[in-house]
From Swiss-Prot:
Species annotation: Parabacteroides distasonis (strain ATCC 8503 / DSM 20701 / CIP 104284 / JCM 5825 / NCTC 11152)
Cell compartments where the protein resides: Cytoplasm
Gene Ontology biological process: one-carbon metabolic process; S-adenosylmethionine biosynthetic process
Region (Flexible loop): 98-108
Upper classification of the organism: Bacteria, Pseudomonadati, Bacteroidota, Bacteroidia, Bacteroidales
Annotated metabolic or biological route of this protein: Amino-acid biosynthesis; S-adenosyl-L-methionine biosynthesis; S-adenosyl-L-methionine from L-methionine: step 1/1
Broadest EC class assigned to this enzyme: transferase
Function, as annotated: Catalyzes the formation of S-adenosylmethionine (AdoMet) from methionine and ATP. The overall synthetic reaction is composed of two sequential steps, AdoMet formation and the subsequent tripolyphosphate hydrolysis which occurs prior to release of AdoMet from the enzyme.
Name recorded for this polypeptide: S-adenosylmethionine synthase
Binding site for L-methionine: E55, Q98, D260, K291
Length: 428
């Protein structure tokens, strides 16, 4: 019997994502000037106010106000009527030094014996239902909001009323074998300007006219653009019977941090697999790679994606766990959901992963090049399923004479650089 599965995403202007992006921008700034920085930075955003808190060990000085305001401006909160605006909002910082008790458990004379920054379990997941080995419902949800933001920033005349805050949700019907059959429902809620109608009509009538315009634009402008980004077999899932809910409350003028308080780390399912697979509970943003909540989750995704791409299974979940101060993981667990393509148990597959991948924190950092300022880009539209690329970044501050320019690789955990080795090990 078929079933329905739903995933959601939120835009870069969603308050929780504003917080995530500020935290990761601060992390990047510290790493740009000191690659050995230890950072755990949390952000709260609300009406007209940003609050920064956390622990840092670094030789770098970062102008946290400058960084936070730059992120807010980049997202698009640049008008006073938003009641959260880059130049005028308050920025309060309570960032202090990292605990010595934690640091003694992490740093070692032999870097490869560097202990995990905390205990916990982390998961990586991959499925071959999309070209980027991500669950389709989540991938579509991200694409809807990525394209909406692109229209807002690059083609404002198309949908001139758009504001930064938005959410999406996609429901897909699957068959018993986990194959997508059709898109059932699409939900898009986007913040918009107040609509002032011509004289002689009420505000209610003006709101209804605005709602009608937004719904039409989503169906006629946004959906076709997103559909065109996918291969033919995914395009075929779009159909005339899709249920659309566009701004279902009828109005979405008050939004962003003025509408809801935002906090770092509250969109961990959006950040990962949209409810597919599993999650260990640890958030990513604002954490340097000594925190295995982040680095080991990326490494587990790297394993799962390369294993599925190599043909070991059509779907795979990988769990890894750590004790604080201990380098070697407690375990590696694999679940192929009965979709393995090799004549092995999941336990036997996990045993081979131990032989292929060094999962000590320092080895992960080096393999995935995680000591670079690569994190701001991860903080919106998902940490997984993104395209690996090399970019040039420049960091500058009014307090430092020379800017820092560096070439960095983004989303290294999405590279299929171990697929051939896996094929050799598994005889594929």
């Amino acid at each position: 019997m078929s079933y329905l599965f739903t995933s959601e995403s939120v835009s870069e202007g969603h308050p929780d994502k504003v917080a995530d992006q500020i935290s990761d921008a601060l992390l990047d700034e510290f790493l740009a000037y000191d690659k050995n920085s230890k950072v755990a930075c949390e952000t709260l955003v609300t009406t007209g106010q940003v609050v920064l808190a956390g622990e840092v060990k670094s030789s770098a000085y970062v102008d946290v106000q400058e960084v936070a305001r730059g992120v807010i401006e980049k997202i698009g909160y640049t008008k006073s009527e938003y009641q959260f605006e880059a130049k005028s909002c308050g920025v309060f910082s309570s960032i202090h030094e990292q605990s010595g008790d934690i640091n003694r458990g992490v740093e070692r004379a032999d870097p490869y014996e560097q202990g995990a920054g905390d205990q916990g379990m982390m998961f990586g997941y991959a499925t071959n239902e999309t070209e980027n080995y991500m669950p389709l419902a989540l991938d579509l949800s991200h694409s809807l909001l990525w394209e909406l933001a692109k229209i807002r920033k690059e083609e404002p005349d198309l949908m001139p009323y758009l504001r930064p805050d938005a959410k999406s949700q996609v429901t897909i019907e699957y068959d018993d074998n986990g194959k997508p059959l059709r898109i059932d429902t699409i939900v898009v809620s986007t913040q918009h300007d107040e609509f002032i109608g011509p004289k002689g009509i009420s505000q209610k009538e003006a709101d209804e006219a605005m709602q009608k315009r937004i719904a039409l634009d989503v169906k006629k402008i946004l959906i076709p653009r997103v559909k065109a980004q996918y291969p033919a077999h995914v395009q075929a899932l779009f159909n005339d019977n899709i249920i659309y809910h566009v701004n279902p409350t009828g109005k979405f003028v008050i939004g962003g941090p003025h509408g809801d308080t935002g906090l770092t780390g509250r969109k961990i399912i959006v950040d990962t697999y949209g409810g597919k697979g599993a999650h260990g509970g640890g958030a990513f943003s604002g954490k340097d790679p000594s925190k295995v909540d982040r680095s080991a989750a990326y490494a587990a995704r790297h394993i799962a994606k390369n294993m599925v791409a190599a043909g070991v299974a059509d779907e795979m979940l990988v769990q890894v766990s750590y004790a604080i101060g201990v380098a070697k993981p407690m375990n590696i667990f694999v679940n192929t959901f009965g979709r393995a393509k090799v004549n092995m148990t999941d336990g036997e597959i996990a045993a081979k992963i131990w032989d292929i991948f060094d999962m000590r924190p320092k080895a992960i950092e080096e393999r995935l090049k995680l000591r670079n300022p690569i994190y701001f880009e991860t903080a919106s539209y998902g940490h997984m399923g993104r395209k690996p690329q090399t970019v040039t970044k420049t960091f500058s501050s009014r307090y430092l004479q020379k800017p820092v320019t560096c070439d960095v690789e983004l989303f290294t955990w999405e590279k299929l650089d171990y697929a051939d080795k896996i094929k050799d090990v598994f005889g594929l």
